[in-house]
Amino acid sequence: MGNRPLDILNDALNTSVIVRLKGAREFRGVLQGYDVHMNLVLDEAEELKDGEIVRKIGGVVIRGDNVVYVSP
């Protein structure tokens, strides 16, 4: 495992992650890709509220400037 944030994202590729966004929105899905701006591509994504599934989205691109944290 690397020390830098992008190393951690690289280690998390093709695994399930939880992404917290500004405004307290939260998504869970399989991390398929990312870039240097921390834009994320999730597959099998679900929107969560209080740990419960609100809706299933499928594939989604999340803009990096909205990301608060990514939990592998």
Swiss-Prot record:
Q: Please state every residue range assigned to the domain named Sm.
A: 4-72
Protein transport keyword on record:
no
One GO cellular component term of this record is: ribonucleoprotein complex
Q: Name one GO molecular function term.
A: RNA binding
Give the Pfam families listed for this entry.
LSM
Matching PROSITE patterns:
SM
Report the PANTHER family cross-referenced here.
SMALL NUCLEAR RIBONUCLEOPROTEIN, U6 SNRNA-ASSOCIATED SM-LIKE PROTEIN LSM7
State the name under which the record lists this protein. Answer: Putative snRNP Sm-like protein
